[in-house]
Amino acid sequence: MAAAVGLRGLAVAGGGESTDSEDDGWEIGYLDRASQKLTGLLPTEEKNETFKKALTTGDISLVEELLDSGISIDSSFRYGWTPLMYAASVANVELVRVLLDRGANASFDKDKQTILITACSARGSEEQILKCVELLLSRNADPNVACRRLMTPVMYAARAGHPQVVAVLVAYGAEVNTQDENGYTALTWAARQGHKNVILKLLELGADKMLQTKDGKTPSEIAKRNKHLEIFNFLSLSLNPLEGKLQQLTKEETICKLLTTVSDKEKDHIFSSYAAFEDLEIFLHGLGLEHMTDLLKERDITLRHLLTMRKDEFTKNGITSRDQQKILAALKELEVEEIKFGELPEVAKLEISGDEFLNFLLKLNKQCGHLITAVQNIITELPVNSHKIVLEWASPQNFTSVCEELVSNVEDLSEEVCKLKDLIQKLQNERENDPTHIPSMDEVSSWNNRILKRTAFTVCGFGFLLFICKLTFQRK
């Protein structure tokens, strides 16, 4: 066979499911154009080898020539992969289009590994993957068919960090809250991998952030376990007012809106045009940043996105340093960080200064103040009458049970703080009564001040007494 073979490559099954051998029968290299003219004279086995090389190099004209010579569009190569599956695995859009136009089966699967799943986990840019996925969906590929591990295409797209692909899959009917064999949803996979933009998109599309894995973990807890603390804090915020917004639209309206948003290549962060900005306007007004409203609306930046922006994203979106400082200061006030046990003062080892312990108590008190303010705000905003609630709520019993747990925890906290106060008072009393206690500089300074004051008062009194005595003596 007249082919100058370069590197030998491994075509990896979509979703990270590797094959059983290091050689899958694919040769990645360059074809001698002279050999292409002899395709009509090649035996079937050599035609298949030439066909594989043409697919590997993306030589569309040779692929079409081989198909015209009678080679099957659904040829089965080693491990059962078809030409379309391989083209999808490398996100070759033009090759996928040619094969589909020639009659390739978009719904083919090999051991439940579908072509759509292969495309969603392909190697390539999101733009190329998105086009491949759109082509397959337009040829009736089912977005809800799962692999052997019960992972669906939207889970693979979320795990790979492709928010636009996720949006298109959902627009074509993909279920966002399906769970795999471990109880992971698409949102859980995005949280595990730290893909913030995918999480934003999934929440807008109605993803349930309270669904738990088989070991009882929510997406926020999965994010925390994998050191994505920004996402953990973000998912721990109150419910998103836009959550499930798309589900109110018809399929045609959803596809139109999502594809319109996706086609804008100049935007790094994709947010749909249907988002509401009331919360954003209120937030900006409270900071005196009303002038930013139009800028953020033009860039389709929601409040949820704004609250999770990094400093470089602020600059990229035209937000000035002064405005950045106001937003970051507000976020710092809103943020209630979890205190890690490893960061607590080592009181038992007596390695803590008074200032450090005081700072710890002040920080704890400030966090309690934030929690009180948050609850007060919720009480103020909560509708008094049930008919004023626009969104569908779960059973009120769920809310009341959580509130009861909160009350119990607050009572426990109060009890523990009282114990801490009594302990500190006891230590203080013992310290004052300890004869071996060496007073600190502050105590010495305070004692010296008291001595000086008493001495001055005594001298003044004695002088005044002498003056009275002298005056009396002169009168006599």
UniProtKB/Swiss-Prot annotation:
SUPFAM superfamilies: Ankyrin repeat (SSF48403), Pseudo ankyrin repeat-like (SSF140860), SAM/Pointed domain (SSF47769)
Major site of localization recorded for this protein: cytoplasm
Residue list for modification Phosphoserine: 18, 21
GO biological process, one term: cell differentiation
GO cellular component: pi-body
KW Cytoplasm (keyword) present: yes
Intervals holding ANK repeats: 46-75, 79-108, 111-145, 149-178, 182-211, 215-244
Record-annotated SAM domain positions: 273-335
Source taxon at top rank: Eukaryota
Entry keyword set: ANK repeat, Cytoplasm, Developmental protein, Differentiation, Meiosis, Phosphoprotein, Repeat, RNA-mediated gene silencing, Spermatogenesis
Compartment(s): Cytoplasm
Self-association state and partner proteins as the record states: Interacts with DDX4, PIWIL1, RANBP9 and TDRD1.
Function as written in the Swiss-Prot or TrEMBL entry: Plays a central role during spermatogenesis by repressing transposable elements and preventing their mobilization, which is essential for the germline integrity. Acts via the piRNA metabolic process, which mediates the repression of transposable elements during meiosis by forming complexes composed of piRNAs and Piwi proteins and governs the methylation and subsequent repression of transposons. Its association with pi-bodies suggests a participation in the primary piRNAs metabolic process.
Name of this chain's protein: Ankyrin repeat, SAM and basic leucine zipper domain-containing protein 1
